Amino acid sequence: MRIDVLTLFPEMFSIFNHSIIGKAIEKEILKINTVNIRDYTIDKHKKVDDYPYGGGAGMVMAAQPIVDAIKTVKKENKGKVIFLGPKGKTFNQNLAKELAKEEELIFLCGHYEGIDERAYEYIDMEISLGDFVLTGGEMACIPIVDSICRLVDGVLKSSESYEDESFYNGLLEYPQYTRPAIYEGKSVPEVLLSGHHENIKKWRKAKSLIITNKVRPDLFKKYKLTEEDKKILKDFNKKL
């Protein structure tokens, strides 16, 4: 997958040179480029923003450098142009899965009070990280790109690495434990030490269902319980 990020602060994306994403870039599974929007302004002082028409607080990013940056990147990257903004669709795991199927994507990070409305003509999709305000689109772009990239084939060692994680199948993840088996008098659940894979699988599913219902009832209501899920919960409750 190729991703181009249009931003005023390309240095912020050096985080992708590390950990799992960094290794995937080294293996050429991923290619993440940053493009400095300021390089495309025609203003002699390298300005990319100006005061809003009609008055108001703050500054607005001008259309010209944004549009010229998009046009240049589009010569090599034919992917969707995604703007990180508050009016967009709220990002979630299902959207991450959909975007992970794409071969190319372009992300546009806004700043200041937003972007000139005329730049929207070159944008295919707007995504929001949630109902809160951030200093710039970069803060939203980094977790969104990370979430998408880790679902790309070959980035993680196996699909099991993300299929059991929170949100992937509509549930929160089950509790995890590592050595030692007893810490401060608290033991790892016996089933996890049993080596019985089927019982471990059922315990994890039951825990995911119970935790989701308790912590995120909104998610649990959307989740469609199967007959197997109901049986797993019934058997689990019998053992309590």
UniProtKB/Swiss-Prot annotation:
Subcellular location: Cytoplasm
UniProt binding sites for S-adenosyl-L-methionine: G110, L129, G130, D131, F132, V133, L134
UniProt EC number: 2.1.1.228
Reactions the enzyme catalyzes: guanosine(37) in tRNA + S-adenosyl-L-methionine = N(1)-methylguanosine(37) in tRNA + S-adenosyl-L-homocysteine + H(+)
Family: Belongs to the RNA methyltransferase TrmD family.
Role this protein plays: Specifically methylates guanosine-37 in various tRNAs.
Complexes and interactors: Homodimer.
Protein name: tRNA (guanine-N(1)-)-methyltransferase
Species for this entry: Clostridium botulinum (strain Kyoto / Type A2)
Species classification: Bacteria, Bacillati, Bacillota, Clostridia, Eubacteriales
Encoding gene (name): trmD
